[in-house]
Amino acid sequence: DNTIVIFMSDNGGLSSEPGWRDGEIHTQNYPLNSGKGSAYEGGVREPMIVRWPGVVKPGSKCDKYLIIEDFYPTILEMAGIKGYKTVQPIDGVSFMPLLKGTGDPSVGRSLFWNCPNIWGNDGPGIGPTCSVRNGDWKLIYYYETGKKELFNITEDIGEHNDVARQHPDIVKRLSGELGTYLRKVDGQRPSFKATGKPVPWPDEIY
């Protein structure tokens, strides 16, 4: 009873064989769109199970979001380790409040992904992309084309309804937030073969 069990994974289900990402056979991540390597939820979203006797209520559920960087500070807090020092700043935040039901660290928080390289086979959401999630909204920016997609994840978890044209203000806000973050962390981005110049940041195209 003094053991904490955490079950999770690092990405969506693998479906990289030709035809698996965009055909009827692609169902293992339902209702999420696409799979591993995709910027869509099917590539970045995973369920998690935590067993912690006396802390996590058995059978309870939580629909809040977090990211893998959050596990480091959370596990240290679980172990009761305080006042520790790290070589670099910690990117994650502890999700202990979610486990205890005392708060929600995702409120007002943005999560970022940057995949500037070509990965595996083609398919929905596959290719050099960067994206940001804030609250209900998720913005995906395609480096190769400059295209942006906006989804309300709460209402459209399958990401089938791109509402970027209906909400240009949200697209602009999230593009700015994403571009600012990528510059801050010196994020990589592709370059044009013809000129060797880097493609625009998401907030340089509207």
Q: At which residue positions do the language-model features occur?
A:
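Short acidic capping loops at alpha-helix termini that bridge into adjacent secondary structure
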Residues: 1-3
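Intrinsically disordered, low-complexity polar regions and short flexible loop motifs
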Residues: 156
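Catalytic cores of eukaryotic secretory-pathway lumenal/extracellular enzymes that build
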Residues: 45-46
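Active-site-proximal N-terminal segment of extracellular/periplasmic enzymes that hydrolyze or transfer
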Residues: 18, 161-169
